[in-house]
Amino acid sequence: MHLLNLTLSSPTNVSTAVVGSFSGSKSQEILCVRGGTKLEIFKLNATTGQLDTIVSTEAFGTIRNIAGFRLAGMTKDYILATSDSGRLSILEFVISPTPHFESLYQEVFGKSGSRRIVPGQFLAVDPKGRSCLVGSLEKTKLVYVLNRNTEGKLYPSSPLEAHKNHTLVTHIVGVDQGYDNPLYAALETDYSESDQDSTGEAYENTQKHLTFYELDLGLNHVVRKWSEPTDRRANLLVQVPGGQNANSDRFEGPSGVLVCTEDHIIWKHMDVEAHRIPIPRRRNPLVQRGDKSRGLIIVSAVMHKIKGAFFFLLQSEDGDLYKVWIEHNGEDVVALKIKYFDTVPVANSLCILKRGYIYVASEFSDQNLYQFQSLAEDDGEQEWSSTDYPENGNIDGPLPFAFFDPQPLRNLLLVDTVPSLDPITDAHVVNLLGASSDTPQIYAACGRGARSTFRTLKHGLDVAEMVSSPLPGVPTNVWTLKLTEDDEYDSYIVLSFPNGTLVLSIGETIEEVNDTGFLSSGPTLAVQQLGNAGLLQVHPYGLRHIRAADRVDEWPAPPGQTIVAATTNRRQVVIALSTAELVYFELDPEGSLSEYQEKKALPGNATCVTIAEVPEGRRRTSFLAVGCDNQTVSIISLEPDSTLDTLSLQALTAPPTSICLAEIFDTSIDKNRATMFLNIGLMNGVLLRTVVDPVDGSLSDTRLRFLGAKPPKLVRANVQGQPSVMAFSSRTWLLYTYQDMLQTQPLIYDTLEYAWSLSAAMCPDGLIGISGNTLRIFNIPKLGEKLKQDSTALTYTPRKFISHPFNSVFYMIEADHRTYSKSAIERIVKQKESEGRRVDTLLLDLPANEFGRPRAPAGHWASCVRVLDPLANETIMTLDLDEDEAAFSIAIAYFERGGGEPFLVVGTGVKTTLQPKGCKEGYLRVYAIKEQGRILEFLHKTKTDDIPLCLAGFQGFLLAGIGKSLRLYEMGKKALLRKCENNGFPTAVVTINVQGARIIVGDMQESTFYCVYRSIPTRQLLIFADDSQPRWITCVTSVDYETVACGDKFGNIFINRLDPSISEKVDDDPTGATILHEKSFLMGAAHKTEMIGHYNIGSVVTSITKIPLVAGGRDVLVYTTISGAVGALVPFVSSDDIEFMSTLEMHMRTQDISLVGRDHIAYRGYYVPIKGVVDGDLCESFSLLPYPKQQAIALDLDRSVGDVLKKLEQMRTSSAF
């Protein structure tokens, strides 16, 4: 088996984000690391207030940290990146000719991989961009001086060591000293004594130190300048501005760092008295007597400079933002102050833009962009100052707690949301829309805690509808018109009906007008705004050129002939007559249409004609394309010296029904200018796209795609200011450019018969379309998104969900640890009120999706079972479980004693602890399914001795993985009845898959086991095969009777297959006697599976589904990851494809595609060498190579560059999207 790995949707979680002017302009961009492997740059769109993606590039390596820097005299920021390649990479973002990243230098500093003593975990940059420090978790610290050579190129110097043995590093940051020698601060813990002390006493006395390292630029040497003990719970350092202003003697700030510890924030600098303040916290209304107070830490921070001042925004682990500022007199700190600012989702990074926005890169779920409404000055919110405490807060022991009441957003305004799927905890791929959709939908359980969502992912672009209005009939075409060439907005909407034409005026309202000069008694074939102030109408019997209100020039069709097709632009008109002739018109300098004297005879009757828009600076477009009923398309010249000469001819496989010439930018074909594409819609529903040579009109690089059962209609459109093509078949498709690559995607919208661009005051960048007898005005808010997302809010973290066997209903289990359930909250509130204690219920009533929930001690759980309607995106019902009972598994089972009806079984644990793993008791809850799956009725529950981590229905019984045991249960009147079990599994049973009488069991740490059930002479569950390698299994799916695809906790997908002869031998043993007496092999089962495929995805795989993704396509393995990515493993169908893609992959590995210098084979084979899988993402980056390199690779493959690109597109579109 050979597979091709394709990414369908990139990872969405942001591990790190920095802000800078990476493009060199005055505007700022946000650089994000998505999924640890992808570099992405956002830019704020000043018009819409939204974030637009400028470039997104796969690094083919795990990026550990990034930072921006700028050397003196430079006009743009550069990027430093550390990764698992063991190299320090200097990257540049280049905006032209197409936005992309360039790797300027890669300095090797250690072994590959993410190791604790290899630098890369921490990256700190001198604020003046002169040097950087790269640190590891333990011991190693390297300092590089950043220089420019004689050619002006950046490069790092040889590394200067600042190692310290037996030292653990918590955080490193650059200290702002102005133009003094670069200084770095580190939080370090010396464990040398603890390592030698077996009593643990040395560990209890271990201190954490704040250490300053100075780079002496004169001596080119690093010294350990200052070190002082600090709070051992310190976890984060924040840079404080310092140094003198370049234009005055004023100090920018006091320098030093903010040390963020548990419950406190401390300002520290060398040999200066520190200032300490408490971190304000929320009151917990549910805290009980005897509960230990939970500490509060800062998890992210950002510093922002404004004119003559600066402030910090620090975020706690609850999501609360605090404004911190320092009152100082030169270099002397007067006071350190803090106040509550607002509450936003917990973030990995915070980025403040100069335009007054803050980007919150959330740890989980959607990332948000907020606009500052105020800086919380004089808002009445309580402030806490270091001067409020003795010795500026530097007293032994903790400071008194400071409390605040969280409030809805007051200083920030949410303006944009970047959808994010991470983490995907479970997913199913299934087509619940039936015949109305030719592709399945991806249903995913996403998020954590109160921000969790259930999401429906559909392939296509989202559409925002603005107007939907019924019409008196069913129109065939729709157009919009400007009155003059210089008009900003369209003035008319023209609708063509089979027996007439309707003209609507666009103003404050849309209303019918009659005095336009258009012929309204018959259908219209085309309309156009001609020249400066002319309008054109083409109808079956002639042309009407409306030059003024009282002047209409008409051109009648020859007697006995009609116009069957027409195409126009603002200076040219071509019509096709029913006598297989073409007539060409061109606008003369006086503004009149001049007919070319000769008619062009065609080889067959014309079915469609098209010309492109007039290029800027020219008087005409050069080519005309004509489709004829003899299954040919001709390219005809419109140049003065060769007018109506046929330049090229292409035979087709079916008659063309629509044709469209459009100039669209596609960097895979031409990296410098737009490409002229000829798009042809055929009678059989296929879209052909071919490239027209701009010199001789020859056709090349033809590609095809099946769009639907209906013959496509094609039309040019402007979408978000760029030329595009719309295709109307059984679905509506859009061909457009995104990140300089041509994309073809369907619209998630009602089927349209026709559409046109619309520019109006209410909709400057819209589209107008017709669907039946309804007029629709809509726009496409965001291009580039392959999957449209519809979400339903959940209460707790989703764990697993399953679908009803026959109805479109999902059953989901949710559970959160350290969270009070609803019954627990009611109990505690009643108990406190009975004791006469005040309970602030206002805090409990705050929206949990914005403020979270009060934290409970370990062992407390909140959980529920939810019934979902995925088509309506709504919750049908919710069943809350008992206090501290959490659901971990769910299945639908048919029981022999159940009357043939399905039952829902939920596995739960009570008082579950995670470390060590265990529970007070477990239960199997059984629910009857009523009213077509929409109602659940509790029947009974069965006690177990461990947590049921997985369940599955099996031949009228229930299989349950409970701890190390696999058990078989039968339905009873008051409980489930255990019939047999196998407790020979090593650690814990986490997955169960059933095929006939065969059971594939996934163990938590020891991979998969093949089992069979035998009822003669007694009921038995027998293991007959297992894996030879230990694997930490996360998900398993059956590929065929002998083969399984599995994912593990280290980001690997692997395919295991059982020898068919062994499989047949086991099936022929009705009693299992042979299995029982076979000799164990390698301390396991008698037989071993063979690994036939292995590939490292780079993120934990949470689900795998076998299903075809496109109409008529073959089955693929669709997987999801915890970082929010969706991908597919596509099987090859021929040995030629395997050889071609494998050879192309081999060539691409030699092209230094990785921005961080990671070896591709080592990356994709991180734990086990790659086997049987080709990296499709790497192969598709062939289109990004310079043309000479593309030619060299294509020559080795005995193909042209166009053939290689065509094959890559075909491999994706034939099985995925």
Swiss-Prot record:
Transmembrane segments: none
Entry-linked SUPFAM superfamilies: WD40 repeat-like (SSF50978)
Gene3D superfamilies according to UniProt: YVTN repeat-like/Quinoprotein amine dehydrogenase (2.130.10.10)
Keyword Nucleus: yes
GO molecular function, one term: U2 snRNA binding
Pfam families membership: Beta-prop_RSE1_1st, Beta-prop_RSE1_2nd, CPSF_A
Keywords carried by this UniProt record: mRNA processing, mRNA splicing, Nucleus, Spliceosome
GO cellular component terms listed in the entry, alphabetical order: nucleus; spliceosomal complex; U2 snRNP
Coiled-coil ranges from the UniProt annotation: none
Cell compartments where the protein resides: Nucleus
Domain of life per record: Eukaryota
Biological process, per Gene Ontology: mRNA splicing, via spliceosome
Record text on subunit structure and interactions: Associated with the spliceosome.
Function: Involved in pre-mRNA splicing and cell cycle control.
Record family assignment: Belongs to the RSE1 family.
Descriptive protein name: Pre-mRNA-splicing factor RSE1
